[in-house]
């Protein structure tokens, strides 16, 4: 199992304090996954907390500037993953307590790329992060979907 997580990383290239996060964004790490059996994407929380721009729905012809916005970056992420791993099951884990704009964007973009969304609920948290109990609940909710 490979867990490829960076603390504070965003899907898009915009990070906290409007810093350039292209060195750690999800969209710039897709080539590092190797040959996975399954891909679980748990993102959007830091994009929301960093107040990254939402951007427009855009499904191709991305320019560098577009990827500093959440929607085009998520579309590029899923497009790249589908191209690199056409036979791998991909799931998006949608955290609870995000802005409706993020939730709706994730659902719409994931639908375009046929990526199931696992919407988390009732996750016990402390300072916005899952507690041990919350992580167990998260695991249970994800396993319930991927074991089908």
Indicate where each model-derived feature is located.
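Loop/turn elements at helix/coil->beta-strand transitions in domains of secreted/extracellular proteins
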Residues: 1-2, 34-39, 85-90, 113-116
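Conserved SGNH/GDSL esterase-like catalytic core that processes O-acyl groups on lipids
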Residues: 1-59, 63, 129
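Residue-level recognition of beta-strand->loop/alpha-helix junctions
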Residues: 3-5, 94, 119-121
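Short, electropositive alpha-helical surface patch
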Residues: 25-28, 99-116
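Active-site segments of SGNH/GDSL-like serine hydrolases
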Residues: 42-52, 74-107
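The substrate-binding groove and active-site-proximal loops of carbohydrate-active enzymes
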Residues: 60-69, 122-130
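Aromatic/hydrophobic pocket-lining residues that form the small-molecule binding cavity
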Residues: 70, 74, 135
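Histidine-centered active-site loop/cap adjacent to the catalytic His
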Residues: 126-148
């Amino acid at each position: 199992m490979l867990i490829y997580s960076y603390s504070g990383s965003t899907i898009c290239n915009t990070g906290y304090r409007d810093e350039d996060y292209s060195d750690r964004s999800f969209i710039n790490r897709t080539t590092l996954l190797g040959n996975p059996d399954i891909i679980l994407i748990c993102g959007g929380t830091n994009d929301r907390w960093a107040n990254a721009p939402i951007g427009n729905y855009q499904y191709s012809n991305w320019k560098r500037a577009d990827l500093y916005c959440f929607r085009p970056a998520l579309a590029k992420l899923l497009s790249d993953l589908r191209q690199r791993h056409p036979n791998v099951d991909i799931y998006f884990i949608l955290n609870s307590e995000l802005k409706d704009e993020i939730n709706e964007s994730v659902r719409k973009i994931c639908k375009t790329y046929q990526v199931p969304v696992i919407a988390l609920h009732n996750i016990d948290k402390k300072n916005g992060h899952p507690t041990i109990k919350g992580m167990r609940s998260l695991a249970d909710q994800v396993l319930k979907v991927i074991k089908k």
